[in-house]
Design a protein with these regions (language model features):
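Catalytic-core helical/loop segments in enzymes performing group transfer/polymerization on anionic/lipid-linked
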Residues: 1-674
Length: 674
């Protein structure tokens, strides 16, 4: 573990207390100052070795640790641990030294990160929903009193005791004109754990709050917060509330809180930005658990915000209608940790399950694969009192083809229309038409776009054959790439009111560019034999057919791309290649493409980065392939890069078992021809 400060060349592989001792052990690592680290601390003391304390950071994960979402932040302390005020800690030293060590650039990052946390309403754990409390009583202030569980090591470390909690509660109740709410851990109410305040709060007639609630939602509905050592107190400071500390948490003693105790090592005033910068930017370390790479605070904020946005939107009960057994294995992951999914084969039974809802309850939802959803299904579901949501592959899908049963890394789920359905507005189209991206959103989209271009990523990323020198073949003629599609695909039916075949597309491109060197690239699924869409060998229609090669490598050698509605048009567009559309894909109609068909609904002129922000960041759902957790676009790009590298060097293979080969033939013969 080089990050702990071991010199280069030293073996840093960890050994565990109880193993045969090694003479080259330089330090002992344990989990904070909790009982589980007692043996490690004792071992360090007996052998005269430094003890290094590890703990979860202040911005941990989407859900609780018990729900198995991995942590993204950790603190490493060589002196003590942040919640033990009985001795110095690295964090305390960082705060003390803040005026001399924190440059303006670091404080600017702190201010921006604070604003991001407020905007995305993020906390250490981010599973709690927004809730509305009853209105305040007239002429009364509302104080929040935060209880803690009895086994919380920060209580003793924060120089507190059970009497401290009781004194805190009694002090709050003695304030005239005050409505006292006590935040009690749900496990305490259920009798699974012990707290400090439950019985006393009941005796004093306080209002008990045991339901999970987003801290930011809670802060908006109280006037002040009293804590002993809970991190909730620091988050209340971030929300601008007055905070009274009855113990000595890491943020007390710096002039930010009303303190009932003192720590002689503290006492110098520090700003909120200084304490935040020390705790979240200097003291904490971050890693993306899905890429297994170090990360910045800003990257973790964005990842958590994306996870929370997707999980919140998709929370609740679902019926998955007519999904194949293969898709059933992974569809549930894309609905997030707060969803419940039941699969149903028969539409009649799914519709019967849509029982009438109470007034104000959200409609029950049916999920269907868009390409297999009959036109009448939406009306049937609506009449039964439900909502139909449709699902399709996302735009950064996989290393390997969907027709070869390669699991996707991204899908899109839409309750309005699919992005390829030009007859009505999808959620993506509405976002592009009505949302005004911020400078931050556009900058993020630009970074993502530039990374995709530099890595040469596309939707499938499976082919890597060397391309010929097209400029030499074209001999100074304009090079036009015509991208074929699967003619039975739902996107052709819904987004192409005019020409609908690859042959007609080639003829239209040749008519517009009679002197050009026309290259035809059929769809990978057609080349693989899995789908229908071959063209005739009409002389003069095209000059070269390229069935192999990564399409992203083609973009550097062509002058223009023609497509019906292929995603390849979007991939070319973000690389600066002029694109002519003969259908109405999601990226047409925004002033970025040469469109042969108009869409009156699309009235804005967008930048490429605004299009990327909607299509690659906001619209899709991304899932980590190893854990099945929600993730985000940047994470999936790194995973795709890693998988493609493994494919190239032979450590990952895309084998085609006999079942897949049989499926290809079956699909080409029966499914792909409707």
């Amino acid at each position: 573990m080089p990050e702990l400060g071991a010199p280069k060349g030293i073996n840093t592989a960890p050994e565990f207390v109880g193993q045969k001792s090694s003479t080259n052990i330089m330090r002992v690592v344990g989990w904070g100052h909790k009982p589980t680290a007692k043996r490690a601390r004792q071992y360090a003391l007996e052998h005269g070795l430094p003890y290094v304390a590890l703990e979860d950071g202040f911005l941990r994960s989407l859900t609780l640790a018990s729900a198995d979402y991995p942590g993204m932040a950790m603190v490493v302390d060589h002196q003590g641990i942040y919640y033990d005020a009985r001795q110095p800690s690295d964090l305390e030293q960082l705060i003390n030294e803040a005026p001399t060590r924190q440059a303006e650039a670091l404080l600017a990052r702190a201010r921006a990160a604070l604003e991001s946390l407020r905007m995305h309403r993020l906390s250490k754990y981010n599973h709690a929903p927004e809730r509305k409390l009853p209105a305040r009583k007239p002429c009364m202030q509302r104080l929040l009193i935060v209880d803690q569980t009895a086994e919380d090591a920060s209580v003793v470390g924060g120089m507190a005791s059970p009497e401290t909690f009781l004194a805190m509660l009694r002090e709050a109740c003695a304030i005239e004109g005050t409505e006292v709410w006590v935040k009690v851990h749900p496990d305490v109410i259920a009798g699974k754990k012990r707290g400090y305040l439950l019985e006393e709060a009941r005796k004093l007639g306080c209002t008990l709050l045991s339901d999970d609630i987003n801290p930011w939602s809670l802060f908006e509905q109280v006037d002040g917060v009293h804590v002993v050592t809970s991190q909730l107190g620091f988050e209340a400071l971030m929300a601008g509330l007055p905070v009274t500390c009855h113990g000595m948490p890491f943020y007390a003693g710096w002039g930010l809180t009303d303190d009932r105790q003192q720590c002689p090592r503290r006492g110098q005033s520090r700003t909120l930005e200084q304490v935040f910068a020390a705790a979240y930017l200097e003291y904490s370390r971050y890693a993306n658990p899905y890429t297994q790479q170090a990360a910045t605070l800003e990257e973790i904020i964005q990842l958590l915000a994306d996870q929370k946005r997707m999980a919140t939107r998709l929370a609740g009960r679902w019926q998955g209608l007519e999904f194949s057994g293969w898709k059933q294995k992974f569809i549930g992951y894309f609905l997030g940790p707060w969803s419940q999914l039941h699969f149903e084969k028969k539409p009649e039974r799914a519709l019967q399950r849509l029982s009438p809802q109470d007034t104000g309850s959200p409609p029950q939802r049916i999920l269907s694969w868009a390409g297999r959803t009959p036109p009448e299904r939406q009306a049937q579901v609506r009449e039964a009192g439900g909502e139909l949501w449709m699902m399709e592959d996302g735009f950064l899908r996989s290393v390997g083809l969907g027709v070869d049963l390669t699991r996707p890394l991204s899908l899109v789920v839409d309750d309005k229309a699919m992005h390829f359905d030009a007859s009505r507005a999808s959620t993506l189209e509405e976002w592009l038409e009505h949302h005004e991206p911020s400078d931050t959103e556009l900058a993020r989209a630009r970074r993502l776009r530039e990374r995709i271009i530099s890595l040469g990523l596309s939707k499938y990323n499976s082919q890597d054959d060397t391309l010929p020198d097209l400029r030499e073949l074209a001999q100074d003629r304009e090079i036009v790439l015509v991208v074929g599609q699967v003619e039975s695909d739902a996107s052709i039916r819904h987004a192409c009111p005019g020409i609908r075949t690859n042959q007609a597309l080639l003829e239209a491109a040749r008519e517009l560019h009679p002197e050009a060197y026309v290259i035809y690239k059929p769809h990978p699924d057609v080349v693989s034999g899995g789908r229908v869409g071959e063209v005739s060998q009409t002389p003069g229609t095209y000059d070269l057919e390229l069935s192999k090669g990564n399409i992203s490598d083609l973009f550097t050698q062509i002058d223009r791309l023609h497509t019906l509605c292929s995603l390849a048009g979007f991939e070319a567009l973000i690389r600066g290649v002029p694109v002519t559309t003969h259908g109405l894909p999601f990226y047409a109609g925004w002033g970025l493409t040469d469109d042969q068909i108009d869409c009156p609904r699309r009235t804005r002129t967008l930048s490429v980065d605004a299009l990327v922000a909607g299509a690659l960041i906001e619209y899709p759902i991304y899932v980590d392939p190893d854990r099945g957790d929600l993730c985000n676009a940047e994470t999936v790009v790194t995973i795709l890069e890693r998988q493609r590298t493994m494919l190239r060097n032979g450590t990952m293979r895309l084998s085609l078992p006999w079942k897949t080969r049989l499926y290809r033939g079956y699909r080409a013969l029966f499914i792909g021809k409707h």
